[in-house]
């Protein structure tokens, strides 16, 4: 879908959504606690997303609205997702952090998230990965990503207990089979 005013041009869309005009009916404020970005968006476009459909339904049943504020961990990535509703493709990125945050925000907005479980995280960035997950949350795919990228020498005590339990429980059968094989060998 290409938005008629922008014809697939991201710069035109960013400019268009940065200005209030008679076409926009929602002032959407994206905030991360320290920064804010205001987009003048269109309810009819956003309501095609389940998250916004639910948000609009809630507000319509409560009171009249034209301003909505949403707290997101990464404003620029949230904007990329909003721009997608207007026909602007997501930027190509090889940055694993961008992909993880895109995945988490797609989950947040109730969209089909990109797959991240097969990403390769450089060993020296594994600690950064854990810190990102502690700060912003995790999904089953991210837990699998942690398991697949964990360096052998990594202190697992630095990984949150709930993630360790998920890793253990999802691999319990493998551990049991390996234990049987180990006993059969010895």
From Swiss-Prot:
It comes from the Viruses. This is Uncharacterized protein L49.
